Amino acid sequence: MATLLFDDGREATAAEIEAIARAHRIVVEHRPVPAALAETLARPLLDDTSAATVLDALPPRPEFPSRDLIVLHPDRPDNEQLATKFENWHRHAGDEIRHILDGAGIFGVIVDGQRADLHVGPGDFIVVPAGLEHNFRLTAARRIKAVRYLSDAEGWSAEFTGRAA
């Protein structure tokens, strides 16, 4: 289950996470990863056929006609380049929707003027609403597999804000 840590080191309670998420239109849910995917998701990298198998095992979301699977792992040659790009603070014209299937990451958000880190792992489903400034960082393990749901490709383009990472 997702946890929220503030810059001062304090961890938000479940009630605080719910209140903060509601106030900022962030969706944080837990949707279990199908057990049938365990063997496929255990692989460090996935080819197109394996990625399609993963996507086919998850129900489509009609409101988000496009989806793909992002796989970041130390064995991926461009892993650090991609990870660094996501670490820059940005916003999108459309919602950013992720269903974490394997690994872990951290969505940084600004809550009431204070930076907060939403730690996500397998089964966490998060929607960062359009226009909300955020970033994404890998944990020390440097790996994650997540479905990205898109309403359209244009709304997904990042507008970098210049805030220091």
Curated annotation (Swiss-Prot):
Cofactor(s) the protein requires to work: Fe(2+); Ni(2+)
GO MF, any single term: acireductone dioxygenase (Ni2+-requiring) activity
KW Iron (keyword) present: yes
Catalytic activity: 1,2-dihydroxy-5-(methylsulfanyl)pent-1-en-3-one + O2 = 3-(methylsulfanyl)propanoate + CO + formate + 2 H(+); 1,2-dihydroxy-5-(methylsulfanyl)pent-1-en-3-one + O2 = 4-methylsulfanyl-2-oxobutanoate + formate + 2 H(+)
Coiled-coil spans in chain: none
Cofactor remark: Binds 1 Fe(2+) cation per monomer.
Pathway(s) of this molecule: Amino-acid biosynthesis; L-methionine biosynthesis via salvage pathway; L-methionine from S-methyl-5-thio-alpha-D-ribose 1-phosphate: step 5/6
Residues at the site labelled May play a role in transmitting local conformational changes: D95
Keywords: Amino-acid biosynthesis, Dioxygenase, Iron, Metal-binding, Methionine biosynthesis, Nickel, Oxidoreductase
EC number(s) reported in the record: 1.13.11.54, 1.13.11.53
Annotated site residue numbers, Important to generate the dianion: R98
Complexes and interactors: Monomer.
Free-text function comment from the UniProt entry: Catalyzes 2 different reactions between oxygen and the acireductone 1,2-dihydroxy-3-keto-5-methylthiopentene (DHK-MTPene) depending upon the metal bound in the active site. Fe-containing acireductone dioxygenase (Fe-ARD) produces formate and 2-keto-4-methylthiobutyrate (KMTB), the alpha-ketoacid precursor of methionine in the methionine recycle pathway. Ni-containing acireductone dioxygenase (Ni-ARD) produces methylthiopropionate, carbon monoxide and formate, and does not lie on the methionine recycle pathway.
Family: Belongs to the acireductone dioxygenase (ARD) family.
Protein name per its UniProtKB record: Acireductone dioxygenase
Gene: mtnD
